[in-house]
C-alpha cells in the first residue's frame, strides 16, 4: 500500500474517526461503506488486529513496510514495544508540524515538509519521516499556527516549534490498541 490518495470519507466510515486524516465528516452516510454494509457481522480476532494496524497506517500516512520498519526499531528498545512504536510515529516531522497547528491535516503538513517550508535547527529538511528529538527547534516559513490544542510536549512561539520533553502515550490525539498492532507484526514476523 503506497500513500493513500483515494476517498477519505470511505476510510473514516470503515475505521472510525481519524482526526489528522481529513477535515471532512461523514454526515450523510454514517454506516460502513460498501454494497452489503447493512449486514453487520461480528469481526474476527484477526480482523480487529488488522483494523488496528490499518488505523495506524492511515492516521500517520505511512505504508505497511514503513510501519514494519518502525516496529522492528521499537522491538529493539528496552521499553514496551507498543508504546515505543507510538512514540516513534508521534515524533515524525510531518506529525509534529500538524500537532503544532501549522497545517489543518497530516497530508497538508506532509506537503509543507516536502516543499521545503520547514527547517529543523536552522537546516532545511524535506523528509516527512525525519525523527524529531527533544530540544529540536522546528521553524515553519510564513504560516501562523492555529489555535488548536497543543500537546504538552510541544512549545510554539511565532513560527518556531520546540519539543520540550519526550512524548507520553496519554498525550496522543488518536486512540488505538497498540498491543493488537504488536501482536499482528509479531505474528507476521516483521
UniProtKB/Swiss-Prot annotation:
GO MF assignments: rRNA binding; structural constituent of ribosome
Location of the S4 RNA-binding domain: 92-152
Main localization of the protein described in the UniProt heading: plastid
The organism's place on the tree of life at top rank: Eukaryota
InterPro entries reported in the protein's UniProt record: Ribosomal_uS4, Ribosomal_uS4_bac-type, Ribosomal_uS4_CS, Ribosomal_uS4_N, S4_RNA-bd, S4_RNA-bd_sf
GO cellular component, one term: chloroplast
PROSITE patterns the UniProt entry points to: RIBOSOMAL_S4 (PS00632), S4 (PS50889)
Gene3D superfamilies: Ribosomal Protein S4 Delta 41, Chain A, domain 1, RNA-binding S4 domain
Family: Belongs to the universal ribosomal protein uS4 family.
Subunit structure: Part of the 30S ribosomal subunit. Contacts protein S5. The interaction surface between S4 and S5 is involved in control of translational fidelity.
Protein known as: Small ribosomal subunit protein uS4c
Biological source species: Cyanidioschyzon merolae (strain NIES-3377 / 10D) (Unicellular red alga)
Amino acid at each position: 500500500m503506497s500513500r493513500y490518495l483515494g476517498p477519505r470519507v470511505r476510510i473514516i466510515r470503515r475505521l472510525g474517526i481519524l482526526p489528522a486524516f481529513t477535515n471532512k465528516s461523514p454526515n450523510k452516510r454514517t454506516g460502513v461503506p460498501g454494497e452489503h454494509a447493512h449486514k453487520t457481522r461480528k469481526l474476527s480476532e484477526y480482523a480487529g488486529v488488522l483494523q488496528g494496524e490499518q488505523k495506524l497506517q492511515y492516521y500517520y500516512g505511512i505504508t505497511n513496510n514503513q510501519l514494519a520498519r518502525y516496529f522492528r526499531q521499537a522491538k529493539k528498545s528496552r521499553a514496551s514495544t507498543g508504546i515505543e512504536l507510538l512514540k516513534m510515529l508521534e515524533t515524525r516531522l510531518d506529525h509534529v508540524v500538524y500537532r503544532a497547528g501549522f497545517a489543518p491535516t497530516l497530508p497538508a503538513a506532509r506537503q509543507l515538509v516536502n516543499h521545503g517550508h520547514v527547517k529543523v535547527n536552522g537546516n532545511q529538511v524535506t523528509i516527512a519521516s525525519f525523527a524529531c528529538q527533544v530540544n529540536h527547534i522546528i521553524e515553519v516559513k510564513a504560516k501562523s499556527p492555529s489555535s488548536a490544542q497543543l500537546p504538552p510536549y510541544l512549545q510554539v512561539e511565532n513560527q518556531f516549534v520546540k519539543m520540550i520533553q519526550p512524548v507520553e502515550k496519554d498525550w496522543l490525539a488518536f486512540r488505538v490498541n497498540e498491543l493488537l498492532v504488536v501482536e499482528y507484526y509479531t505474528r507476521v514476523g516483521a
